[in-house]
Amino acid sequence: MARYNPFSFTPGPVVFFTTVIYVGLFAALLVTHLTVPDYPSDPPAGINLTEAWADLEHITRRFHPYNSHANDHVRGYLLSRIQGVIATKALDASQVEVIDDLTSNATFSSGATSVYFEGTNIIVVIRGSEDDEPFNSTDRKPNNGGVLVNAHYDSVSSGYGATDDGVGVVTVLQLLSYFTESHNWPKRTIILLLNNGEEDFLNGAKAFMRNPISQVPHTFVNLEGAGAGGRATLFRSTDTEVTRFYSKSKYPFGTVVSGDGFKKGLIRSETDYRVFHGELGLRGLDIAFMEPRARYHTVEDSTRETSMNSLWHMLSAALASTSGLAAVTGEEFSGSESLDNGRVNAGRGSDGVWFDLFGRVFVVFQLHTLFALCVTLLVVAPIALIGLTFGLSKADKNYLLARKAFVYSSDDDNPVQLYGWRGFFRFPIVFVSATAVVVALAYLLVRFNAFIIYSSPFAVWSMMLSAWFFVAWFFSRGADAMRPSALQRMYALIWLFIGSFVLLTIITVFVNNYQVVAGYPALFYFAVVFAALMLSYLELFFAPTKSAYARHFEHDTSSRRNSESASRPLTGSTTAARSDDRPVADDDATETTSLLRGDRRGFTRYGSRRDSTSEGDEDHAQGSRRLDLGNVYPGEQEWSGKLPSWIWIIQLLLLAPLVIVLVGQVALLLTSALYQTPSDGNSPLFIYLAIAALSVLLLAPTGPFIHRFTYHVPTFLFLVCLATVIYNLVAFPFSRDHRLKVYFVQRVNCETGANTVSLTGLDSYVQRIVGELPSAQDQPLNCTTPDVATRKELKTCEWEGLPAKVVPNAAGAAPFGNETNTDRWLEYSIHKGNRSNKATIRVVGLNTRACRIVFDSPITGLAVTGAVSDPRFKPVGAAGSREVRLWHREFGQPWNVALTWDAEEHAKLSGRVVCLWSDANTGSIPAFDEVQHYLPVWAIPSKISDGLVEGFKQFEI
């Protein structure tokens, strides 16, 4: 009885090993992505997680945007905590300096917007043990750089800010405690920055640039949050050298794909990273939480939605990165001389490629290494395959696309059919068919239920993966049943090689020309396909020579010509026959078939050990000496019987694991980053097409083996596909756990008292939401395209809402009454200069520290009383400014704004003076409270701009 080979290329082993590998690795990736490592019961000395959690609960009790009284309370609490840490450890001013920065201000522009901002940052400087130079001296050596760790303590007006950025703030407090332990004291100076005003225009980081201490750090670690809980990912990094310090983290998490997402605008949020690197010149890291985005900037960004594990994940990453950077004593992050443009000379790093493996291992290498490897593979791989093809031809064993073999010469009238071409075009047909189905499903979802991805991303993934696999199996298995081919696996690998070669070529161009490295998995994809294909080439060297195989039938043919009972030709089941003996193609052998045809054996012995005939004996076999063809898989070419039946398992292990891990990681990251962005106005079609493409890349490695699958797994996946298609088409796209974000603002005409409340959101859904609000019922809705550039794909619905009570009638009154006439909410006066194109506007708003001046035509010059000039900042952009945003440290203080405009083009300057109110803690914005109270459970409000309430008056000069 033949022994069973558990690794043979037969249905049982193929189904088992392929299923185990895919299911096991998918499960491991999901566990890594969706769970957070436990925090330690015994953290490092100086770290107190219980204390950190208590701090987080305290600062997130109320909304605390810059323009709120709660913001001042948070600031006072942080100062007291910092002083408490310093006092506990008996540190003096020479070791730790606290800078309560109430003097820095910045005037700058971005596009058509100008900003004047007064900072209230808190800065703690821990002098490094090897830093004995004064911080504010021009004689400070340019290579004596420190490390900046930043978090912002303001929240948005519609969220408590636990993740954005409360966890970052308490992390900074714990770093202060850690690095002021004597045995943890850093060699480099560490600057801990708690900035205020990040949410409104990255204002706090700009104000930090105005402080002289900003010239001390050369590297930075920015702590942020764009979700609620989960793992803190490495959002982006400036260079390879800095990233290597993040790799010291115990639980690294992230991929360079997110960095490219910022570059290409796929991720619309911005962080202080842009200021520190782009304007100050520092090199560093952006570590942030990233999902779920539906809770970002809402009341669900609270301690209830995060955890101690998430806090520890960010803290441990910041601790490892900061410790490493603060221990560098060389000049790796320093230029040779100081710069005179206000930027820090932190040297130049190399663009990098980085990704984690299961949240435990972090891989980092340089971009030019990626480029070199890509070019090398693109050159070496085709040459190697050409060489192997030549070797097979020299050995007379090249069955690829071989149609026939001759016993004596090419003049032989009776060649033996090899059928080496069979199955060559099979894989591209299968691939295109399956891919077309998943692309069609993407368009189907957009047509009938475009936003189901918002709440059910894994249902969409299940649909795409199961659809592609079933369709690919159906066509591949059907073709194999009709025309079996021993070369189907190799031909599939050849087509995969061609496709991945083209993909890698494109990626290489992007790497070289645009420094976009998000396609790094293509390098590994191509490498494993190349390795697997080489094994198939080497496998053919085990086949008999074509000449020996042809002579194998010489005696058989002679015998059959002399026997009337053996007149039936060799058939398609053996797939080797004389060309003139094939009146019927692809018939099965019967009892009339010659018994001397190649020692035909049953499939039960496929893959078992057999005695083989030597090559020399094959070439000289005569008469009754027959060629031992081994065990042929039913229906496949007889010359394939001697091919090793176990090579496929090595090919599967080469192809599947690395592709699943690298592509799967990118797939999960992109899903997390994008699946809830349609509420921001992003196109859902792009998301579905991205999932379809990634599904194809994930499952394409099954192509060479899928024809061996029995119907069981594909049938199950067909049922999964059917169920998920139905669900994805009919299910409501939002839920209590995945709420649709809508954006709130209330605008009050302070001259007439008229107020308009608006919600901006997805078309058709925002109308349903507004219809459930008591104040909007029985009112005509005006739904238009929003005037916010980043929300153009949404709809804004307006109605007359509940009056705002943002200005108290008497000092200290809360909740505020509405007895104060709206005309007194803001005041302005205009003083015209001696020239027709100059004027000064004095603006003051009650109970606010944020106002704007919006112009109908651009201004060309701007100067705010008290502003400090900085050559790094341009008050007005090249095309002028249409809006000036004004921020004070104190409530109710005036701004004096001197303006210049082009009088030749615009004889008059007109526009609006607007003041903002953002404090939703005291019941002073009843319209916002109403929205929060009456919104359906599947929706949640967020702010659309800096203020929840905007009061305005018109002006003309």
Curated annotation (Swiss-Prot):
One GO term under biological process is:
proteolysis
Q: Which InterPro entries match?
A: Fxna-like_M28_dom, M28_fam, Peptidase_M28, PFF1_C, PFF1_TM
Q: Where does Zn(2+) 1 bind?
A: 152, 164, 224
In the UniProt record, which residues carry a glycan? 48, 105, 136, 782, 818, 834
Stretch list, region Disordered: 560-591, 603-628
Q: Residues on the Cytoplasmic side?
A: 1-10, 391-423, 472-490, 543-642, 707-713
Q: Does the keyword Lipid metabolism apply?
A: no
Using the UniProt record, give the first listed, main subcellular location. membrane
Write out the residues that bind Zn(2+) 2.
164, 199, 297
Intrachain S-S bonds:
none
- How does the protein associate with the membrane? Multi-pass membrane protein
Cofactor: how and how many bound: Binds 2 Zn(2+) ions per subunit.
Q: Which Pfam families match?
A: Peptidase_M28, PFF1_C, PFF1_TM
Where along the chain is the active site annotated? 198 (proton acceptor)
What is one GO cellular-component annotation here? vacuolar membrane
Q: Which cofactor does it need?
A: Zn(2+)
Q: Where is this site: Transition state stabilizer?
A: 296
Q: Which PANTHER family match?
A: METALLOPEPTIDASE M28 FAMILY MEMBER, VACUOLAR MEMBRANE PROTEASE
Function noted in UniProt:
May be involved in vacuolar sorting and osmoregulation.
* The protein's name in its UniProt record: Vacuolar membrane protease
Say which species the protein is native to: Pyrenophora tritici-repentis (strain Pt-1C-BFP)
